[in-house]
Amino acid sequence: MTIYTGSGVAIVTPFFEDGSVDYDTFGELIEFQISEETDAIIVAGTTGESSTMPDDEQVAVIKFAIDRVAGRVPVIAGSGVNDTAHSIRLSKEIEKLGPDALLVVTPYYIKTSQQGLIEHFEAIANSVDLPIVLYNVPGRTGQVMAPETILHLSQHKNIVAYKDAVGDIAHTLAVRNLVGDKIDIYSGNDDINVPIILAGGKGTISVLANVYPKATHLMCKYALERQVDKAFGLQLKYLDFIHMLFAEPNPMPVKKCVELIGKSACHYRLPMTHVAPTLATRLEQEIARLNSLQGE
């Protein structure tokens, strides 16, 4: 099964200055995304700062998103943490809320073997009756899930998709070559959204979409339709800005940008903190430049 095609936003979680969740603003961000044709909402992932949330709060944030979206687009909920038993408990609790799928990251800090990854994901997949998106992000976890491991896991009935945040199109091609259509691939790196879709991907799980949701939707739409010139035109138009979004650790820059476009105050939970003033200025200037351009 395909959960969605196109642009899924890895949505930020807005906080008040005291660190509590700003649910009113969160609802407004969800409405902004849907109004701009975002194809799916990914909540409580890396960009949503789920690693700073206790389980009960993460569940509450996910429940709020599911209730607010009310079936208009798919909601994928982050449920992976760095040990298997905890991931199972959290996944089962989130399953009760009715998300369309779970996003499960490879264990971080606790590095294991490829066989350990297989057993970890199979144990989680066996514990729930929901589609699971594997999430491979070695820049945050310190470990790459190998294409052969993804092939093995694709045989499980509940493991239906793969978020590729390795940042190397050669890895994506290796996965595609091995796995074929057994599992859907989503880009986890906005700077190669179009190449991954042209390599057979179904779309993106995007940080960029927090700031430019319509453009990200169109970028994916054109790539899926094989309107290559239009797709690459948008990929290249936003490329410098995408790189700025990762000039400091995500989601620090993107939350600043969400503030700059007037959608949310910029508050974090430590150890996340405000970007350097020089980067804040560059982000503001680039947003102004992009907004001054004609077209999509």
Describe every region a protein language model picked out.
Residues 2-9, 13-142:
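Active-site beta->alpha loop and helix N-cap motifs at the rims of alpha/beta catalytic domains
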Residues 3-14, 32, 36-38, 93, ...:
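C-terminal alpha-helical cap/extension of soluble enzyme domains
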Residues 17, 23, 55, 147, ...:
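Alpha-helix N-capping/helix-start residues
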Residues 26, 58, 62, 87, ...:
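A general structural signal for well-ordered alpha-helical segments in protein cores
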Residues 60, 64-69, 93, 97, ...:
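Alpha-helical structural signal in soluble globular domains
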Residues 72-73, 131, 160, 182, ...:
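Secondary-structure boundary/capping positions in well-ordered alpha/beta enzyme cores
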Residues 126, 140-246:
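Catalytic alpha/beta core domains of metabolic enzymes, predominantly
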Residues 136, 158-159, 269-270:
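Glycine-rich phosphate-binding "P-loop"
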